[in-house]
From Swiss-Prot:
NADP(+) binds at Y26, G27, S28, Q29, R49, S53, D83, E84, I85, Q86, G134. Substrate binds at S252. It catalyses: (2R)-2,3-dihydroxy-3-methylbutanoate + NADP(+) = (2S)-2-acetolactate + NADPH + H(+); (2R,3R)-2,3-dihydroxy-3-methylpentanoate + NADP(+) = (S)-2-ethyl-2-hydroxy-3-oxobutanoate + NADPH + H(+). Residues 183-328 form the KARI C-terminal knotted domain. Pfam families: KARI_C, KARI_N. This is Ketol-acid reductoisomerase (NADP(+)). The active site is at H108. It comes from Streptococcus suis (strain 05ZYH33). Its EC number is 1.1.1.86. Mg(2+) 2 binds at D191, E227, E231. Keywords: Amino-acid biosynthesis, Branched-chain amino acid biosynthesis, Magnesium, Metal-binding, NADP, Oxidoreductase. Involved in the biosynthesis of branched-chain amino acids (BCAA). Catalyzes an alkyl-migration followed by a ketol-acid reduction of (S)-2-acetolactate (S2AL) to yield (R)-2,3-dihydroxy-isovalerate. In the isomerase reaction, S2AL is rearranged via a Mg-dependent methyl migration to produce 3-hydroxy-3-methyl-2-ketobutyrate (HMKB). In the reductase reaction, this 2-ketoacid undergoes a metal-dependent reduction by NADPH to yield (R)-2,3-dihydroxy-isovalerate. The keyword Transcription regulation does not apply. One of its GO terms (molecular function) is magnesium ion binding.
Length: 340
């Protein structure tokens, strides 16, 4: 199925005008959505539990309330808290304060699609999911453009849910550069698969395996780090800018020939079958239940995984090498660090 890119000209209804908007959470995405919407003239308040984020929201000039009070005051509520706490937050503080005709928004379909959150039939449920971290959503907005976004409607109680989703996307700047309509199911399952099989899980496992092959063969860990991890950004940037074609035009003929010859030897049909198994676990809800159950148990699996990852040789070698490269990491990520 193909989808058509939409832009500001396609947002024909100012569905958020006259609405009081509550952004729940003031982290990476929360601060960006709230500030961008305020800058486009909308009435935005923040709902967040007492702590650093509460103080930061007030410092940034927002009316800031506990979550329940913000939900009570709002017509449109966007939940931008971490996935694992959303269900409790919704059930305890938001659901009791919902009214018929309200709209409830998300930037990721996880809790709605897997039914950890169940919304009354008289409330709109929509999604606006910018395809970038919050600091980028904010920075690009300030520069006059934005980050592309997905939008979706799960429940249209008022007949206005799609207009709300699109106007939200316009308000955060995404309609300046492009919107794609999707569903909660599609966004959730594709997003999780991308993270697990390719972007995060697949990529880190590939780099770790390459590092181990080289060091186990007697090559210096420092050189192995450069070859399988440090240079990854250079290649990914080329692909990001112009696809596989630009990357292959930019590398040596030797590298390009090796790409064609050896890539399929590494990513075999069996690897593809393994990816299908990952997708099946996502589609069935197994991954979602494992993740939520681990959180409810105090995160024993997550903490064990983190501890194991911290002790990998590739991490230790990389930490030492980066000390000699002050230019690495010297960028505009301050906002990301502040809000997380």
């Amino acid at each position: 199925m193909t989808v058509t890119m939409q832009y500001e000209k396609d947002v024909t209804v100012a569905a958020l005008d006259g609405k009081r908007i509550a952004v729940i959470g003031y982290g990476s995405q929360g601060h960006a959505h709230a500030q961008n919407l305020r800058d486009t003239g909308h009435d935005v308040i923040i709902g967040v539990r007492a702590g650093k984020s509460f103080d930061k929201a007030k410092e940034d000039g927002f009316e800031t309330f506990e979550v329940a009070e913000a939900a009570k005051q709002a017509d449109v509520i966007m939940i931008l808290a971490p996935d694992e706490i959303q269900a409790d937050l919704y059930n305890e503080e938001i659901a009791p304060n919902l009214e018929a005709g309200n709209a409830l928004g998300f930037a990721h379909g996880f809790n709605v699609h897997f039914e950890f959150i169940k919304v009354p039939a008289d409330v709109d449920v929509f999604m606006c999911a910018p395809k970038g971290p919050g600091h980028l959503v904010r920075r690009t907005f300030e520069e006059g453009f934005g980050v592309p976004a997905l939008y979706a409607v799960y429940q249209d109680a008022t007949g206005n849910a799609k207009h709300i989703a699109m106007d939200w996307a316009k308000g955060v700047g995404s309609a300046r550069v492009g919107l794609l309509e999707t569903t909660f199911k599609e966004e959730t399952e594709e997003d999780l698969f991308g993270e697990q099989a390719v972007l995060c899980g697949g990529l880190t496992a590939l780099m770790q395996a390459g590092f181990e092959v080289l060091t186990e063969a007697g090559y210096a860990p420092e050189l192995a780090y450069f070859e399988v991890l440090h240079e990854m950004k250079l290649i990914v940037d080329l692909v990001y800018e112009g696809g596989f074609k630009k990357m292959r035009q930019s590398i040596s003929n030797t590298a390009e020939f090796g790409d064609y010859v050896s890539g399929p030897r590494v990513i075999t049909d069996q690897v593809k079958e393994n990816m299908k198994a990952v997708l099946a676990d996502i589609q069935s809800g197994k991954f979602a239940n494992d993740f939520v159950n681990d959180y409810k148990a105090g995160r024993p699996r997550m903490e064990a995984y983190r501890k194991e990852a911290e002790n990998l040789e590739i991490e230790k070698v990389g930490a030492e090498l980066r000390k000699a490269m002050p230019f690495v990491g010297r960028n505009d990520d301050d906002a990301f660090k502040i809000y997380n």
